[in-house]
Amino acid sequence: MSDKPNAVSSHTTPDVPEVAATPELSTGICAGDYRAALRRHPAGVTVVTLDSGTGPVGFTATSFSSVSLEPPLVSFNIAETSSSINALKAAESLVIHLLGEHQQRLAQRFAGSADQRFADESLWAVLDTGEPVLHGTPSWMRVKVDQLIPVGDHTLVIGLVTRVHAEEDDESAAAPLLYHEGKYYRPTPLGQ
């Protein structure tokens, strides 16, 4: 037990670090335990970009997933508190960039301050359809926003893929960038 006032002890298991107690969620589970469990799940890193009508908007997302092959649908979600949420809700289309291991700084840039995301104009260009596209990304997809579904404190975005681009040069063909336990990683194959 801690000597600090209002401290609450949490349970631990031998292989899991102790998580600071936090308020319970509506289901009765501890928010800190829930976050700790999700941190154990690695995710691919994407950057979503779009044209807001008044300039480019973008953000890092690790919730990207394929939904359907026919029609080609993908999804990701965004917090209702995101600085990009209003522009996203107004957008008809966007670009989802699947980042490579060489793009950790780009992932960090788009997870940081909104006013710095597009500050370096050498990192991006504009497609003929108006969306910003990032240079050197292993692959990206132009997506027409199909559905915006409010889910809890997030919005689930379902998009119809209208264009796919894959880079062929050696650097862009690198392994994907992963996010796990608050850090960036590259995948390595397991022994066969």
Curated annotation (Swiss-Prot):
PANTHER family: FLAVIN REDUCTASE (PTHR30466), FMN REDUCTASE (NADH) RUTF (PTHR30466:SF1)
Reaction catalyzed: FMNH2 + NAD(+) = FMN + NADH + 2 H(+)
Binding site for FMN: T60, A61, T62, S63, N77, I78, A79, E80, T81, S82, S83, S84, A111, R117
GO-annotated biological processes: dibenzothiophene catabolic process; pyrimidine nucleobase catabolic process
Biotechnology: Can be used to remove sulfur from polycyclic aromatic sulfur compounds found in gasoline and diesel (biodesulfurization), which are a considerable source of pollution. As the substrates are not very soluble in conventional media, biphasic systems may help improve catalysis. Expression of dszD-dszA-dszB-dszC (cloned in this order) in organic-solvent-tolerant P.putida strain Idaho allows P.putida to grow on 10% p-xylene with DBT as the sole sulfur source.
An annotated GO cellular component: cytoplasm
SMART domains: Flavin_Reduct (SM00903)
Source organism phylogeny: Bacteria, Bacillati, Actinomycetota, Actinomycetes, Mycobacteriales
Pfam families named in the record: Flavin_Reduct
Cell compartments where the protein resides: Cytoplasm
Residue span of region Disordered: 1-20
GO MF entries: FMN binding; riboflavin reductase (NADPH) activity
Name of this chain's protein: NADH:FMN oxidoreductase
InterPro entries: Flavin_Rdtase-like_dom (IPR002563), NADH-dep_flavin_reductase (IPR050268), Split_barrel_FMN-bd (IPR012349)
